[in-house]
From Swiss-Prot:
Binding-site list for S-adenosyl-L-methionine: 14, 16, 41, 62, 87, 109
Protein name: Ribosomal RNA small subunit methyltransferase A
Name of one Pfam family that matches: RrnaAD
GO molecular function: 16S rRNA (adenine(1518)-N(6)/adenine(1519)-N(6))-dimethyltransferase activity; RNA binding
Annotated GO CC locations: cytosol
Keyword Methyltransferase belongs to the record: yes
UniProt cross-references to InterPro entries, sorted A to Z: KsgA/Erm (IPR001737), rRNA_Ade_diMease-like_C (IPR023165), rRNA_Ade_Mease_Trfase_CS (IPR020596), rRNA_Ade_methylase_Trfase_N (IPR020598), rRNA_adenine_dimethylase (IPR011530), SAM-dependent_MTases_sf (IPR029063)
Location relative to the cell: Cytoplasm
Species classification: Bacteria, Pseudomonadati, Pseudomonadota, Gammaproteobacteria, Thiotrichales
Catalysis: reaction(s): adenosine(1518)/adenosine(1519) in 16S rRNA + 4 S-adenosyl-L-methionine = N(6)-dimethyladenosine(1518)/N(6)-dimethyladenosine(1519) in 16S rRNA + 4 S-adenosyl-L-homocysteine + 4 H(+)
UniProt keyword list: Cytoplasm, Methyltransferase, RNA-binding, rRNA processing, S-adenosyl-L-methionine, Transferase
Major place of residence: cytoplasm
Purpose: Specifically dimethylates two adjacent adenosines (A1518 and A1519) in the loop of a conserved hairpin near the 3'-end of 16S rRNA in the 30S particle. May play a critical role in biogenesis of 30S subunits.
Keyword rRNA processing tagged: yes
Amino acid sequence: MQYKTKAKKSLGQNFLQDENIIRKIVQLANIKKHDIVIEIGPGLGALTRYLLSSSNNVSVVEFDASVIDTLIANCQKYGTPHIYNQDFLKFDISSLENSSNQKIKLIGNLPYNISSPILFKVIKDSDKIVDAHFMLQKEVVERIVSLPNSKSYGRLSVILQYHFDCSMILKIPPEVFYPQPKVDSAILRLKPKNSKELLKNYNFFEEIVKQSFAQRRKTLHNNLKSILKERKIDPSTLPVDTNLRAENLSVGDFVSLANFLS
């Protein structure tokens, strides 16, 4: 592996370089020869090499043009990925040549500074994917997989758990990266749910969740006061107890609340 390229702090780059960890990630992602794989932010190709050894159809989306020559050189012995030099947030997954309409496996060491926008984009593309395996800050993964009544349970937990079965499958120490980040990392697995509770208005559901967690220490009654007043709704008629805080409600509770208020 060549590591000639200096990591760019502005892009949140931390290059993975531990071969054992990389092999473990690919193994956990259960990638087969026939799978269509998209890697987000391949960097210098440490993970890409192993993906090319596992699948016949690997595409990479890399925003930083300066790493692409090194990426190609590092992958040469393993194969050639389809390279898209663009921002994943603007990337159209359906633009991939895929005559069989086969669903896609997403994988990547996500830049810390834009991990949340990427996750919200993946929500929009959830009908096109089999699963996703992302390396993120461990703290972020813990928030995503958190259950109600915990301090780390929040907006990200509710929204992602509505769409996916979410699990933390591997913890990763800082020492396996170049340069070393100041935080621990973890692998998040997202598997789209086969069936989701029906929502009357998804955008309104997102807004209710956002408002409910706006001030964590306040009750739902206080956080949703303006919405309840605008709709002239008596809080006692709601399907949830508004004296609770948002962190006490399950994903299903938020669905019921949003549907009632829609």
